[in-house]
C-alpha cells in the first residue's frame, strides 16, 4: 500500500543524516513554499554590457518623471542603470579637467605609456584616468599613438613609478621609434574606491594582489638586480631606483620587487642603502631594469600574522540611498556625493561631492520622513580625515545636506556611541534607525528639537558581521553576527538556525565585509550571500523564510550552486522584480577600461521563470 511521506520544510544540518528523520538535509537551487520544496526563480542579464570591477552597492529609486534608476557602485566605477543602458556617473576629483604637456613617453615594441605630470599627483595603481576629447590632444612625436587612441577613453593606472609619473597600458604596442615627454592632453581623475576583495594581514596578500592600500608608492629599478645578495649597478649594499620620493628613510623599511621583499635602512639621493635581500619569508630572484618597486613598509611580512586584527583591508564599498530624486553615494571611509535624477540629461552628468559634508565615514543613510543625512563612523572635525572616529555619528540639518554645524536655529548634531570599537552599519527601519557596532545594537529615533534624535542601546554581544549583513522587514531587523543570526522586534532575539554550523564552520571571516543580505518579498525570504573559508568572493547563500517560519519550526535553507551567489541584491519595490549582481573575478575584459585585470560584474533580474539565462539549472533536495 502506498503511504504518503511527510517532510518538514527547510534544511536541518544540525543533526546527522540518519538523525534527520522526515527532514531535508541538503539541496541546491530550491526554496520552500507552503511547506514543500520547489525550484527557485530564474534570472536573466540586464543590459548587454558587463561592469568594470566588483559591485559592492546597489540601490533603486525613481525620479519625478517616473524614470526608474538603479545605482550600482563597483570598486572602480559608480554606474546608473536605466532603460537597459549603463551610464558612468562616477565623481571626478578634478571635474573641470587638468591639462598636461610634455606628457607622453613610449618605447618601441611596448604597450606601456608613461604619463608625466607637471606637479605631484595622487594616483594609485589601478585607479582610473579619463582623457578629454580630441581637441585637448597635442601630437606625440615618434609615436604611432594618435588622438583617437586616448580621446574620451578610460584607462586603469598600471603602476606609479614616482609622485609625478604613472603608467597605463595600451591595447597595442608602440610601433614608432618611441617618444620622450612629448604631446599633451586633458585628463580627469576618478575618485579612488578600494580593492575588489577583502584580504587579511599578510604582506603579499594585502599589498597589491587585492588592490592598493595605505597609498602604496611605486617606482622602478634603475639597473637590474641579480639573483644574489647584492644590490644593483655593482653595489653590494645599495639599490638605485628611478625615484625615492615619498619612500620612508628612517628605521628599517621594505620594498617589494616581483615577489621578493627587500629591507633597507637609509636613503641617499635615488639609492636605498643598507639593503638585505629576500626578507620576511620571501624568495630571492633576479629582476630586470625597469621592474616595478613597491613600498611595502606598512605591510606585514610574507605569511606572518598581523600584529592585530585591524590590519585587514576593507574592500571598495559604497553606501547608496536617495533623498527624494537625488542619489546620495558614499565611498566607504571616503567622501560623499550626490547625483540629481531630475537634472536635464541627467545620465550625461556625474555625481559631485556634497559641499560641507564629512569626507571620511564608514556608512551613511537618509533618515525619513524627517530628511536628515546621517553619517556613521565619521569625522569629529569635518574635512579632516585624520579625525575619523569609528564610533562617531554626525547628521545634517533637516532638509539641508550641506549644513552640519549645530546651531540654535538648525537640527544638525552629533553623537558618539560607547559600546564597541567601530560602527559596522546602519539600516532605516519603520520605527527607528538601527545602528550596529561590532558588539552591540543601538536605535536612533527622531524626537525633534532640542535633541533631534534619541539614542538607545538595544542589545549586546550581537554586533553586525559586515556593513551589508542586515535588513529590516515590516518593523523587524534581521542580521548576521559573528556568533549567529539575530532579530529585533522591540526586543533582542537570537534566532534558531538549523544550518548554523554549516554556515559558520565554513565562513571566511576575514572577508566579512563582502557578506550581503537581501530581501525577496515576493516569497518572504531573507538571504545572506557569503564567502566560504576557501574563497575571497561570495560563493554560498543561506536563506530564512520569514513568512512561513514558526517558533517551533524555523525554515532555513542553503544554496552552494556556483551559479547563484551574488555580490549585491535589491528587492522588487521599484522594478517589480528583485535585481542582483554577480562578480566574476576570473573574467578579464577590457570593457572601456584598457588593462582591467580585476574581473567584471553582471547585473541580473531575478524571478524570471525558473531558468537562468535561458538555460536549465541543477535542482535537487536530499533527505
PLM regions and their residue ranges:
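Beta-sheet repeat architectures centered on beta-propellers
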Residues: 1-96, 195-199, 317-319, 461-476, ...
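Small/polar beta-strand repeat architecture
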Residues: 90-236, 242-316, 344-348, 352
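Beta-rich globular "head" domains
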Residues: 121-133, 373-376, 525-528, 617-623
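Structural hallmark of WD40 beta-propellers
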Residues: 66-69, 325, 431
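Inter-blade boundary loops/turns of WD-repeat beta-propellers
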Residues: 63, 83, 134, 267, ...
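Short strand-coil-strand connectors
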Residues: 75, 83, 256-258, 332, ...
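Beta-propeller and closely related beta-pinwheel folds
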Residues: 42-62, 90-95, 300-313, 345-515, ...
Amino acid at each position: 500500500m502506498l503511504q504518503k511521506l511527510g517532510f518538514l520544510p527547510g534544511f536541518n544540518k544540525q543533526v546527522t543524516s540518519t538523525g534527520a528523520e522526515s527532514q531535508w538535509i541538503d539541496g541546491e537551487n530550491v526554496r520552500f513554499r507552503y511547506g514543500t520544496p520547489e525550484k527557485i526563480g530564474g534570472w536573466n542579464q540586464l543590459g548587454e554590457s558587463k561592469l568594470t570591477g566588483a559591485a559592492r552597492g546597489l540601490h533603486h529609486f525613481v525620479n519625478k518623471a517616473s524614470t526608474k534608476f538603479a545605482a550600482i557602485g563597483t570598486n572602480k566605477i559608480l554606474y546608473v542603470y536605466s532603460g537597459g543602458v549603463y551610464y558612468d556617473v562616477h565623481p571626478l576629483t578634478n571635474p573641470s579637467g587638468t591639462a598636461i604637456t610634455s606628457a607622453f613617453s613610449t618605447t618601441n615594441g611596448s604597450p606601456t605609456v608613461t604619463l608625466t605630470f607637471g606637479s605631484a599627483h595622487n594616483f594609485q595603481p589601478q585607479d582610473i584616468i579619463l582623457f578629454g576629447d580630441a581637441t585637448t590632444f597635442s601630437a606625440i612625436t615618434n609615436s604611432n599613438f594618435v588622438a583617437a587612441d586616448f580621446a574620451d577613453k578610460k584607462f586603469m593606472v598600471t603602476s606609479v613609478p614616482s609622485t609625478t609619473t604613472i603608467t597605463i597600458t595600451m591595447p597595442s604596442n608602440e610601433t614608432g621609434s618611441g617618444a620622450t615627454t612629448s604631446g599633451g592632453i586633458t585628463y580627469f581623475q576618478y575618485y579612488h574606491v578600494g580593492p575588489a576583495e577583502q584580504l587579511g594581514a599578510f604582506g603579499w596578500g594585502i599589498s597589491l594582489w587585492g588592490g592598493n592600500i595605505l597609498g602604496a608608492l611605486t617606482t622602478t629599478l634603475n639597473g637590474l638586480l641579480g639573483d644574489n645578495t647584492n644590490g644593483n649597478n655593482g653595489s653590494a649594499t645599495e639599490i638605485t631606483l628611478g625615484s625615492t620620493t615619498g619612500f620612508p628613510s628612517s628605521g628599517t623599511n621594505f620594498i617589494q620587487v616581483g615577489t621578493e621583499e627587500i629591507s633597507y635602512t637609509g636613503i641617499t639621493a635615488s639609492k636605498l642603502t643598507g639593503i638585505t635581500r629576500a626578507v620576511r619569508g620571501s624568495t630571492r630572484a633576479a629582476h630586470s631594469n625597469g621592474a616595478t618597486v613597491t613600498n611595502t613598509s606598512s605591510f606585514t611580512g610574507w605569511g606572518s600574522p598581523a600584529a592585530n586584527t585591524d590590519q585587514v583591508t576593507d574592500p571598495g564599498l559604497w553606501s547608496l540611498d536617495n533623498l527624494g530624486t537625488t542619489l546620495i553615494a558614499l565611498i566607504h571611509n571616503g567622501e560623499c556625493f550626490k547625483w540629481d535624477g531630475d537634472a536635464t540629461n541627467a545620465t550625461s552628468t556625474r555625481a559631485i561631492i556634497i559641499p560641507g559634508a564629512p569626507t571620511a565615514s564608514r556608512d551613511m543613510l537618509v533618515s525619513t520622513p524627517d530628511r536628515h543625512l546621517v553619517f556613521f563612523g565619521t569625522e569629529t572635525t569635518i574635512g579632516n580625515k585624520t579625525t575619523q572616529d569609528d564610533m562617531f555619528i554626525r547628521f545634517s540639518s533637516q532638509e539641508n545636506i550641506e549644513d552640519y554645524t549645530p546651531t540654535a536655529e538648525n537640527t544638525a548634531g552629533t553623537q558618539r556611541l560607547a559600546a564597541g570599537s567601530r560602527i559596522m552599519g546602519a539600516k532605516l527601519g519603520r520605527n527607528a534607525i538601527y545602528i550596529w557596532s561590532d558588539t552591540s545594537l543601538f536605535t536612533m529615533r527622531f524626537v525633534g528639537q532640542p535633541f533631534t534624535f534619541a539614542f538607545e542601546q538595544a542589545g549586546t554581544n550581537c554586533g553586525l558581521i559586515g556593513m551589508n549583513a542586515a535588513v529590516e522587514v515590516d518593523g523587524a531587523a534581521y542580521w548576521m553576527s559573528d556568533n549567529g543570526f539575530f532579530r529585533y522586534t522591540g526586543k533582542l532575539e537570537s534566532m534558531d538556525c538549523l544550518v548554523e554550523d554549516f554556515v559558520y564552520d565554513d565562513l571566511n571571516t576575514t572577508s566579512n565585509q563582502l557578506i550581503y543580505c537581501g530581501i525577496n518579498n515576493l516569497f518572504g525570504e531573507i538571504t545572506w550571500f557569503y564567502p566560504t573559508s576557501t574563497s575571497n568572493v561570495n560563493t554560498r547563500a543561506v536563506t530564512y523564510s520569514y513568512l512561513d517560519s514558526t517558533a517551533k519550526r524555523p525554515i532555513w535553507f542553503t544554496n552552494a550552486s556556483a551559479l547563484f551567489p551574488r555580490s549585491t541584491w535589491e528587492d522588487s519595490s521599484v522594478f517589480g522584480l528583485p535585481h542582483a549582481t554577480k562578480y566574476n573575478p576570473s573574467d578579464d575584459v577590457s570593457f572601456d577600461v584598457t588593462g582591467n585585470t580585476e574581473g567584471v560584474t553582471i547585473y541580473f533580474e531575478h524571478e524570471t521563470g525558473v531558468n537562468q539565462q535561458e538555460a536549465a539549472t541543477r535542482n535537487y533536495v536530499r533527505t
